[in-house]
Design a protein with these regions (language model features):
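ATP-binding N-terminal substructure of ATP-dependent carboxylate-amine bond-forming enzymes
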Residues: 1-96
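Solvent-exposed alpha-helices and their adjacent loops that cap or buttress functional pockets
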Residues: 23, 38-40, 62, 92, ...
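Short acidic-hydrophobic, aromatic-tinged amphipathic segments that line or gate anion-handling sites
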Residues: 46-52, 123-127, 159
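A conserved helix-loop-beta module that forms one wall/lid of the active-site cleft
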Residues: 92-155
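Internal nucleotide-binding/catalytic subdomain
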Residues: 155-296
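Active-site "cap" helix and flanking loop/linker of ATP-utilizing ligase/carboxylase catalytic domains
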Residues: 249-271, 288-362, 375
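Generic C-terminus detector
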Residues: 372-377, 381-434
């Protein structure tokens, strides 16, 4: 029987999840809360804050949803899945205890240390003076300082010298730029090597990795500018070879799931592994307790299996029997952002080039809406830092990239900013392999 589904969140990731869920014959009516302008072309939107757990659960009960996908980190950390379970509604995503793997950097680093999962050398602190004493004593730069709690993906500072480190500690721990998330910090060694993002499905027993991807965090070309939530992605990641994948499964993926079980907080949902392929082998940079954004926008378009069935098997503990298959092709996503992102930017700029949120007459191209709104007179306008993600799929990465950029050229709004070099690092890696 067709299921009535609610997706919690309101960005490009949620849009990609909704579009993938709609391919399932078992997907009936689909809602998104809070959603956004562009998502409203694909799902009914209800303006409830993703972090308002009580109102969201009340809405889910009242509307008799059969299944809820909690896609955003904050509501997961606040225990939305627990609250839904109490109300008798099955959901995709970890409970509050398991969501700590992302919500607390201290928890995740201590977990890795205890269970021998490869990661950067680190120390944790709650006293700003002691942080600087430690950094001076180590005397190694660059050094990485991370806020313990959630900080919209912006709570990681790479400091090149003592002054930058002191400024960073002040910003996180004293000025409380990220609020209580900065009460504790993790200071860790700077790792080098290619980065790989691997999202995985897990029911707390088995892990089924999705196709690998490569993120582009910096705002500007040549990896310069400030860190953002991500300016584009490609999949698959050429550095993630079958040999690397096997090593990650044995030393990182399965040990992480077993560690969470041993700690009494089994993880069910999407576990995202942020990895660095160092000269000493793969190491974990970070865990996320949900789909990445914009990684989801390249990974799910390549999924050939039924996403709803996969998600339900994660919830029910039957993932071992569930097929998780991806196409052999490639995907590329280019983010169109508001000028000034990630600092100050204007909203409400009219967007041209789209019909019902998509590019007409474009095959193998999907536009995912991150920050858009529809005005009272029906005009699609910008409403965020990251506005749109243009994803193209193709048999090879070169096709997907050129197609994504060609398609992106057809969309315009005032002060549009995009990187022109998404995927170049990956193409270089592919060329070196040949």
């Amino acid at each position: 029987m067709a299921k009535k589904i609610l997706v919690v969140g309101g960005g490009g990731r949620e849009h990609a999840i909704i579009k993938a869920l709609k391919k399932s014959p078992d997907c009936g009516e689909i809602w998104c809360a809070p959603g956004n302008g562009g998502i409203s072309y694909d799902a009914k939107c209800k303006n409830i804050k993703a972090t308002d757990v009580d109102t969201m659960v009340g809405f889910a009960v009242e509307e008799k949803f059969d299944y809820v996908v909690v896609a955003q980190d904050d509501p997961l950390a606040l225990g939305m899945v627990d609250a839904l379970a109490k109300a008798g509604i099955p959901a995709f995503g970890p409970d509050k205890a398991a969501a700590r793997i992302e919500a607390s950097k201290v928890f995740s680093k201590d977990l890795m240390k205890k269970y021998g999962i490869p990661t950067a050398k680190y120390e944790t602190f709650d006293d700003p003076a002691k942080v600087m004493d430690y950094i001076r004593a180590e005397g190694k730069y660059p050094v990485v300082i991370k806020a313990d709690g959630l900080a919209l993906g912006k709570g990681v500072l790479i400091c090149e010298n003592e002054q930058q480190a002191a400024d960073g500690v002040k910003e996180i721990m004293l000025d409380k730029k990220f609020g209580a998330s900065g009460n504790h910090v993790v200071v860790e060694e700077f790792l080098t090597g290619p980065e790989v993002s691997v999202l995985s499905f897990t029911d707390g027993k088995v892990v089924k990795p999705m196709v690998s991807s490569m993120d582009h965090k910096r705002a500007d070309d040549h990896d310069t500018g400030l860190n953002t939530g991500g300016m584009g992605t490609i999949a698959p990641n050429p550095y993630y070879t079958p040999e690397v994948a096997a090593e990650c499964m044995e030393k990182i993926f399965l040990p992480t799931i077993r560690a969470m079980n041993a700690e009494g907080c089994p993880f069910k949902g999407c576990l995202y592994f942020g990895l660095m392929l160092t000269p000493d082998g793969p190491k974990v940079i970070e865990y996320n307790c949900r789909f990445g954004d914009p990684e989801t926008q390249v990974v799910l378009p390549l999924l050939e299996s039924d996403l709803l069935h996969i998600m339900q098997s994660c919830t029910n503990g039957t993932l071992a029997q569930q097929e998780v298959k991806f196409s052999d092709g490639a995907a590329a996503c280019v983010i169109l952002a508001s000028g000034g992102y990630p600092v100050a930017y204007e909203k409400g700029k009219p967007i041209s080039g789209l019909v019902d949120g998509q590019l007409p007459d474009e095959e193998n191209v999907t536009v995912y809406h991150s920050g858009t709104a529809i005005t009272e007179d029906g005009q699609l306008v910008t409403n965020g830092g990251r506005v749109l993600g243009v994803t193209a799929t193709g048999p090879r990465l070169t096709n997907a990239l050129s197609h994504a950029y060609e398609a992106a050229e057809k969309i315009s709004f005032e002060k549009l900013h995009k990187r022109s070099d998404i995927g170049l690092r990956a193409l270089k890696a592919l060329a070196e392999k040949q």
